[in-house]
């Protein structure tokens, strides 16, 4: 089984969006591994665990092919773990991009 964390932060990410405490300022300054997105993981390239608002960013940063995703396990319905609006673009009949012939 292949398991990869895509995001490991709390509901607002890290550093916090509107915070200027010393910890958030330090994280902003250092960047890299000090910047964390909302919680998400992927199993075997075809099952997502949670679907946060950062899913699109996770795809871009990792370069992963999310067209292989077939399942999504939502751990709970809080808005930091489940933002279903992007799922609309995966529905049949929604063509926001070029589709390949089957």
Question: Model regions: which residues?
Answer:
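Extreme N-terminal starter segment of soluble prokaryotic enzymes
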Residues: 1-4
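Arg/Lys-rich, low-complexity, intrinsically disordered N-terminal tails that contact nucleic acids
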Residues: 11-13
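Cofactor-binding loop segments of dinucleotide-utilizing enzymes, especially the Rossmann-like FAD-
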Residues: 8
